[in-house]
């Protein structure tokens, strides 16, 4: 089973396309929707939904995947639920770069203080990070600097922030899932 978390643009047709691409490596892909506007509520909702999906599945190696803001959540929710994560162009600082787009960006700071201390050290090796060199929203060199001590980084030379086409990374994802 692969659990897919969309980014800030939850209505993007690219989400459906990514789900279809993910089905090439696992026919059981679950799309979990969340508001993107209310971080504390989103976290509670995502933990509950992802935990429920894991409990209902007979897959012993489920995977959670997200793009942008979905990558932020996939890393944290995957860690908290004990499953591997694949994150594409993750938004590591939504409290800063979501200001003006959501009602309470400061909630991300509060979420960060409630997370397990040094969770990336504890999560080392359980997350695969794919970063685009053409990300027009985030500086992915900063993302790589923050994550490369803990996770394998794959650089993509063609995609932009939304990562419409993930097919070139499916085999790496499949190998990582196993």
Swiss-Prot record:
* Residue ranges crossing the lipid bilayer per the database entry: none
Query: Record's Gene3D superfamilies?
Result: alpha/beta hydrolase
Q: What are the boundaries of the signal sequence?
A: none
Q: Which family does it belong to?
A: Belongs to the UPF0227 family.
Q: Which NCBIfam families match?
A: PRK04940.1
Protein name (record): UPF0227 protein PBPRA2397
Q: List the source organism.
A: Photobacterium profundum (strain SS9)
């Amino acid at each position: 089973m692969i659990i897919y978390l969309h980014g800030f643009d939850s209505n993007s047709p690219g989400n459906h396309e990514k789900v279809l691409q993910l089905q090439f490596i696992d026919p059981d892909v679950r799309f979990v929707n969340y508001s993107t506007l209310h971080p504390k509520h989103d976290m509670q909702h995502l933990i509950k939904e992802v935990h429920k999906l894991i409990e209902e599945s007979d897959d012993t190696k489920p995977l959670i995947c997200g793009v942008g803001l979905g990558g932020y959540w996939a890393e944290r929710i995957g860690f908290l639920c004990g499953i591997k994560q694949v994150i594409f162009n993750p938004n590591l600082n939504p409290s800063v770069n979501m200001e003006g787009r959501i009602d309470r960006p400061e909630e991300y700071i509060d979420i960060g203080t409630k997370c397990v201390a040094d969770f990336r050290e504890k999560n080392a090796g359980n997350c695969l990070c794919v970063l685009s060199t053409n990300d027009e929203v985030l500086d992915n060199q900063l993302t790589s600097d923050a994550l490369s001590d803990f996770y394998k980084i794959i650089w993509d030379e063609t995609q932009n922030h939304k990562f419409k086409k993930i097919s070139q990374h499916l085999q790496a994802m499949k190998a990582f899932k196993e």
